[in-house]
Amino acid sequence: MHLARNPALKSIYIKIRKRKTMSIGTALALSAPFAVGLAALGSGLGLGRAVSSAMEAIGRQPEASGKILTTMIIGAALIEALTIYALIVFFVVLEKMA
């Protein structure tokens, strides 16, 4: 492992090796950023698919572009809200660890 490059990971690894088990704080420190990354990845993929479908629908029916764009923007806001909620949970967990 290349832990020498990242002192934060090295200190976490040393703590785990000394205890032989992982504490809840360590598990949260390792899993919270991963969860936010997954939320952002899912949000990005979903948003890209929604915009792609909306642009395709506008290409087929240009006269309905107003309704399509309105619906797409509402859907995009809901998709982004889920990522923002994940980020808020991350900061709450980070606060609990400190």
From Swiss-Prot:
The chain crosses the membrane at residues 27-47, 73-93. CDD domains: ATP-synt_Fo_c (cd18121). It is a multi-pass membrane protein. The record marks E80 as: Reversibly protonated during proton transport. PROSITE patterns: ATPASE_C. Pfam families: ATP-synt_C. It is found in: Cell inner membrane. It comes from the Bacteria. One of its GO terms (molecular function) is lipid binding. Its main location: membrane. F(1)F(0) ATP synthase produces ATP from ADP in the presence of a proton or sodium gradient. F-type ATPases consist of two structural domains, F(1) containing the extramembraneous catalytic core and F(0) containing the membrane proton channel, linked together by a central stalk and a peripheral stalk. During catalysis, ATP synthesis in the catalytic domain of F(1) is coupled via a rotary mechanism of the central stalk subunits to proton translocation. F-type ATPases have 2 components, F(1) - the catalytic core - and F(0) - the membrane proton channel. F(1) has five subunits: alpha(3), beta(3), gamma(1), delta(1), epsilon(1). F(0) has three main subunits: a(1), b(2) and c(10-14). The alpha and beta chains form an alternating ring which encloses part of the gamma chain. F(1) is attached to F(0) by a central stalk formed by the gamma and epsilon chains, while a peripheral stalk is formed by the delta and b chains. Belongs to the ATPase C chain family. This is ATP synthase subunit c. The lineage of its organism: Bacteria, Pseudomonadati, Chlamydiota, Chlamydiia, Parachlamydiales. The gene is atpE.
